[in-house]
Amino acid sequence: MDETRNKPPASQTPASHPPASAITEWTDTYFKRTKEAVGKFGDKKVTYAIFMRRPVVCAPRLAIEWLEAVARERGFDLDIVLNYPEGKWVGAGEPILYITGSFYHLVDTETIILQKLGPACVGAYNAFTMCADLPKTAFLAMEARHCAGTEMEEMMAYAASVGSDRAKRKVGAKGFIGNATDATAHFFGQKKGMGTMPHALIGYAGSTVRAAEMFHETFPELPLTVLVDYFGREVTDALEVCRRFPGLAAQGKLAVRLDTPGGRFLEGLDPPGSYAVLERHAPHSIRGYRDETQLRYLIGTGVSAAAIHFMREKLDEAGFPAVKIVASSGFGPAKCRLMAEANAPVDIIGTGSYLPERWTETYATADIIEYDGEKRVKVGREFLFRK
């Protein structure tokens, strides 16, 4: 098999579905019929060009690994030229990679290749912008519950790692330091997933402090991150937990997680109070025009920039400056950008909101540009020819 150029490093758990033997069940029927026709009239060596209609960050590893596995199983030679290494910015319409090989063996793989390439590239783009906008904030990938099955979960965890690595290289960002599940932890250099407690544990315990005690007694070796919004007393419960664990608080091994729902303000805040908080800490963020969504991120209900600043104020005033703040709840690219503008003092963000918001933007497209070395492509796609 020909050596793949600019090939990204192999993943430890490639998305192997479907195996070559099952491709016919999952590919578009017109590809299967084309394969039969090619089998009848003779094979040709073809070159595919694959591109996307929007800027992305190149995240091709899962698609390439799958196609290479198919080539090995079917026993045909495959040459892949990756025009943009993993983690590289790719402009709209630019061929991401060229795939050359037997038309007969490649034709029915197109459906699955596009599935594995497009969404990962958009997810990587989103993860990159989020990490780059908040370079001093660490991120945890919590996409698993938002995914349509384990294959998508793997794809999106991989995407987050690619975008994160780009942000680390470009701006020195902390980026994604881990994720929620064991199966995909390797993408972030971890052996296990990360996480502490859901709201369910607090409901079970009957109080925020008791839930923290239960967790710490069960996992005394782990840093303690405590959800503080269950009873609507974010500030009160956060300070109670800090007083219960003063040693952890002083050592920086205690964090409070804000996950206040969008139906109410964090304890102690309202619209005027939220404006006042940002006036103290980031007045520039509320001086210009803002639409309703931006205002919600800055001074609205839920986990706003004002809420994070307010919690930091209260922790510092009570003598707990080393206690970290973890934020979650809808932290996608737009919200992260506003957090950066407001200088929100958030230490860690747990999010799965780097997942593509508009699925139509994840559609990758493939066209054959050469048949037995002869350039030929449908009119309008000449820009795909090799330069």
Predicted regions and their residues:
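Active-site-adjacent beta-strand anchor residues
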Residues: 83, 99, 227-228, 325-329
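Residues in well-ordered beta-strands of folded domains
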Residues: 51, 81, 140-143, 227, ...
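Buried, small/hydrophobic-residue-enriched core segments of structured protein domains
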Residues: 11-14, 88-90, 97-314, 318
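Structural beta-strand/beta-sheet cores of well-ordered domains, especially the beta-sheet scaffolds
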Residues: 44-50, 78, 138, 222-224, ...
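Short C-terminal domain-edge/linker segments immediately following a structured domain
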Residues: 79-82, 127-132, 172, 258, ...
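Flexible, solvent-exposed loop/hinge segments and secondary-structure transition points
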Residues: 2-107, 111-120, 124
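Gly/Ser/Thr/Ala-enriched C-terminal appendages of enzymes
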Residues: 2-32, 40-42, 58-59, 70-74, ...
